[in-house]
Amino acid sequence: MSRRCELTAKGPQVGHKVSHSNIKTKRRFLPNLCNVTFISDALGRNVRLRVSTNAIKSVDHNGGLDAYLLKANAATLSPRALELKRAIEKKAAEAAPVAKAS
């Protein structure tokens, strides 16, 4: 399991640990990842993802997982999140009323 957010693609960064005597040694800054269960209204089921705390705030701000995934850039999403996005788009297209030509 990689240390990468499934929604925002945040991953580890590299920097220095600096001692009192200013000696620099390499270290990794790991993202704050949580296993979170989101509710998808369009799919009608729960979805468990490994996301950063920043992504949790973004999902809440956008009004839920469905709205966030519809707005999200496909390049930043994991393969699992891309499958969810496509499934949500498909359900949304089915639910939308078909325009009648008159």
Curated annotation (Swiss-Prot):
Region (Disordered): 1-20
GO cellular component: cytosolic large ribosomal subunit
Ribosomal protein among keywords: yes
Pfam families the UniProt entry points to: Ribosomal_L28
A biological-process GO annotation: translation
GO molecular function: structural constituent of ribosome
Disulfide bonds: none
Domain of life: Bacteria
Keyword terms of this UniProt record: Ribonucleoprotein, Ribosomal protein
Family: Belongs to the bacterial ribosomal protein bL28 family.
Protein name: Large ribosomal subunit protein bL28
Biological source species: Bradyrhizobium sp. (strain BTAi1 / ATCC BAA-1182)
Gene behind the chain: rpmB
